[in-house]
């Protein structure tokens, strides 16, 4: 549950790309859907960094966690332990996928974000089936299917299977696949005179390597560009170790244990949902959603790095079976083993009715989340090479080790629950044919009861240990129970006014508050003095214009977040020494976005978007844990990883009624790669393209090209660079570093068969 990167707005269309499938919504009059309000749809899976996740566009705020909902409830309650990609994919089980706006999300869930709004196929009276198959040049095999139909006049059924076999763009040596995911869905629906009731079951089993295979070494040139290290091709060469056993200290008992790479990525969950939709005699629409999910395995592994250095004989580093000291490039590497068990019970009920010009909605959330989680960490030194060797460190006293620094870097533990009980109301009021007002409010009672270990971590840290710190304080390392009872609230107001048939204005203001969540207590956690309300205001305003050729919106946006909690691992520049520090800070972003849908002639469509934004840190201060390294004051610095300029261009053309060509261009402007804004990456284009051919009413074939400009580069942050100052930046010209990279040039092929 290490610190997550900064959050992102999700923009979607229903287009296939990467290792997760997407289905096209089928509109059928006699098909039972779950009755959601569908939002604007954009590219769901066009992600140039990760094939298993929806595409994300940054807006400069720390992540508010899960932004994917299935049948009106979170697909996973929190992705901090039970990750979204381990339990949800946009597959053939879904009837439709749309968006929830930030205003709706704030009121219905307490979270300000654009969110995926997905709904299951429930069936129809006639039999229908769909089979999707996808593959690519690297050997990816993806299969998913759904069958649905009628059992009798009053009963419907649905069943789906999803299978993903993804080796990635290179083969890991310690396992066959970088992502192996299985999803199974089954459900029955009983048709009522004025509604329906459905029971759905879902089973997920998934293993994903994640950051174990998503990092690589490169040469940072110094001007924002990177070069490949000779013999190491970014995106197609593995920086994960060969395999074999490793040693770690279990944070739960302090025992030294052994494990295998890939053995700590098991995820398994059972889920049962009930959906009830009914139209009452007085015109009220009643929608009830309930879900129980049990994930006895919610595990994953994180890899991290520090500084790359040139090893000498004096470092006493050796490859296996060699008595000659290693004298090549090496990097201090870190590993976190995350072990979790998750269980939640979720209920949402809504009653809605139209009164004259008012559309009123009254809702209730009762969401319970139980978490049992811990992580252990260790450090090792590896060669900077493809499939790096883990080097043995030999000491003057005759001892040696490969793995060290046990639980020195942010081992975590928490066990407990949180519960949200909320009442909300919304009203869409058509004041006049030209003026519409939308407003809503939410009041939430939040209770958390969780174990916390508030003590500074050190090498050998574990539950049950007794430790004396540098200041002479001796403590017993054991959990302490934290109980919080708080009220959260959210409110929103939007107004739109249409001056003419074509031209209008729109403005909205939304605010949501919350207190620290259970996952934020897994580290040292906030003290009582640090426990403060998190407030997120969002204010937007702009113009709209629409005619037969163009649909345009241009808006100015302000959004901020106070008291954000972040656990940051910092490295002493030029070394492999690292420490963990808890940070509480704010962020604010002012931006301007213009989006347009353009239809200049029949068959051609262009989606275009331009964003300029300025996300900056507030009250961001790191007291340096290293002698000789100054403290860091990042106030006013641009948020790392967040580009100030974003451009989207998505042209498509229907050559015939059955053949469609499409392209997708994403430009991400200059992004800073560390907190001090000393290091940065130049702007880059992420590109996709494809063709879809509806051969007949049963068969559709397609091809997709990812990164067709074949750009090779790094993105995100640079390992070990957190405290490098602007004055020191010049020293890092043509410097060896490591970080994440773009997906390589890939061609994918798809076939869909409907019957």
Which sequence ranges carry the predicted segments?
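Conserved C-terminal beta-signal and adjacent last beta-strands/turns
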Residues: 11-12, 148, 537-541, 637-755
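N-terminal periplasmic accessory domains that precede
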Residues: 56, 68, 84-87, 97-99, ...
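Short acidic/polar hinge/loop motifs at secondary-structure boundaries
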Residues: 73-101
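Transmembrane beta-barrel wall of Gram-negative outer-membrane proteins
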Residues: 128, 135-166, 170-242, 264, ...
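Acidic/polar loop-and-plug regions of large Gram-negative outer-membrane beta-barrel proteins
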Residues: 191, 196-273, 298-336, 389-411, ...
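Face-selective signature of the C-terminal outer-membrane beta-barrel domain
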Residues: 267-296, 325-460, 496-498, 508, ...
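Structural signature of Gram-negative outer-membrane beta-barrels, strongest in the C-terminal barrel
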Residues: 342, 361, 365-367, 412-561, ...
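Gram-negative outer-membrane beta-barrel transporters
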Residues: 558-561, 578-676, 697-698, 750-754
């Amino acid at each position: 549950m290490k610190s997550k990167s900064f959050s992102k707005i999700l923009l979607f269309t229903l287009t296939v790309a990467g290792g997760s499938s997407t289905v096209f919504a089928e509109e059928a009059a006699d098909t039972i859907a779950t009755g959601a309000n569908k939002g604007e749809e954009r590219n769901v899976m066009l992600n140039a960094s990760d094939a298993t996740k929806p595409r994300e566009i940054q807006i400069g705020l720390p992540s508010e966690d899960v932004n994917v909902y299935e049948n009106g409830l979170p697909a996973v309650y929190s992705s901090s332990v039970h990750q979204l990609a381990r339990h949800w994919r946009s597959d053939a089980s879904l009837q439709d996928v749309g968006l929830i706006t930030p205003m709706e999300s704030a009121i219905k869930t307490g979270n300000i974000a654009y969110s995926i709004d997905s709904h299951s196929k429930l069936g129809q009276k006639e039999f229908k089936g769909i089979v999707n198959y996808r593959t690519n040049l690297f050997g990816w095999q993806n299969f998913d299917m759904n069958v649905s139909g009628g059992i009798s006049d009053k009963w419907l059924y649905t069943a789906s299977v999803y299978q993903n076999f993804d080796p990635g763009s290179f083969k890991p040596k310690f396992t066959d696949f970088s992502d192996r995911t299985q999803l199974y869905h089954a459900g029955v629906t009983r048709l009522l005179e004025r509604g329906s009731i459905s029971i759905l079951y879902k089973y997920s089993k998934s293993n994903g390597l994640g950051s174990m295979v998503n990092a690589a070494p490169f040469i940072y040139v110094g001007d924002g560009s990177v070069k490949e290290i000779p013999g190491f091709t970014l995106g197609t060469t593995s920086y994960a170790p060969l395999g074999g056993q490793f040693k770690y200290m279990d944070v739960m008992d302090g025992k030294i244990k052994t494990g295998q790479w890939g053995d700590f990525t098991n995820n398994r969950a059972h889920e049962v949902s009930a959906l009830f939709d009914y139209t009452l005699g007085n015109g009220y629409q009643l929608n009830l959603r309930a879900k129980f999910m049990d994930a006895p395995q919610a595990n994953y592994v994180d890899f991290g790095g520090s500084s790359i250095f040139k090893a000498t004989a004096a470092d006493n580093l050796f490859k296996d079976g060699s008595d000659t000291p290693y004298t090549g490039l090496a990097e201090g590497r870190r590993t976190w083993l995350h072990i979790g068990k998750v269980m939640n019970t979720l209920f949402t009920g809504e009653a809605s009715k139209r009164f004259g010009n008012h559309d009123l909605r009254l809702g209730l959330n009762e969401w319970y989340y139980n978490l049992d989680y811990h992580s252990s960490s260790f450090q090792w030194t590896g060669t900077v090479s493809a499939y790096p060797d883990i080097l043995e460190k030999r000491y003057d006293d005759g001892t040696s080790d490969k793995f060290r620094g046990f639980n020195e870097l942010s081992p975590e533990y928490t066990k407990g629950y949180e519960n949200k009980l909320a009442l909300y109301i919304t009203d869409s009021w058509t004041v006049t044919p030209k003026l519409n007002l939308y407003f809503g409010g939410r009041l939430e009672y939040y209770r958390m009861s969780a174990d916390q270990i508030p003590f500074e971590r050190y090498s050998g840290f574990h539950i049950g240990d007794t430790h004396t710190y540098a200041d002479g304080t001796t403590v017993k390392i054991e959990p302490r129970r934290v109980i919080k009872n708080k009220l959260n609230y959210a409110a929103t107001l939007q107004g739109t006014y249409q001056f003419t048939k074509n031209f209008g204005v729109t403005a909205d203001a939304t605010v949501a508050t919350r207190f620290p969540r259970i996952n934020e207590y897994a580290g040292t956690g906030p003290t009582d003095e640090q426990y403060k309300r998190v407030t997120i205001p969002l204010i937007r305003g702009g113009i709209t214009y629409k005619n037969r050729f163009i649909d345009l919106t241009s808006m100015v946006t302000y959004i901020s977040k106070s008291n954000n909690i972040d656990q940051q691992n910092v490295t002493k520049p030029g070394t492999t020494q690292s420490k963990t520090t808890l940070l509480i800070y704010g962020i604010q972003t002012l931006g301007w976005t213009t989006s347009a849908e353009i239809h200049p002639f029949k068959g051609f469509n262009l989606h275009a978007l331009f964003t300029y934004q300025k996300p900056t840190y507030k009250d961001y201060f790191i007291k340096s844990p290293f002698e000789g390294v100054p403290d860091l004051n990042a106030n006013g610095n641009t948020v790392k990883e967040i580009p100030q300029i974003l451009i989207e261009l998505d042209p498509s053309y229907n050559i015939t009624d059955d053949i469609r060509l499409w392209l997708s261009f994403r430009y991400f402007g200059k992004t800073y790669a560390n907190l001090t804004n000393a290091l940065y990456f130049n702007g880059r284009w992420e590109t996709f393209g494809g063709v879809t051919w509806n051969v007949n009413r049963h068969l559709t074939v397609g091809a997709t090209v990812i990164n067709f400009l074949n750009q090779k580069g790094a993105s995100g942050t640079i390992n070990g660079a957190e405290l490098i100052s602007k004055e020191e930046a010049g020293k890092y010209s043509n410097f060896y570093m490591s970080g994440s990279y773009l997906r390589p040039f890939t061609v994918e092929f798809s076939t869909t068969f409907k019957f």
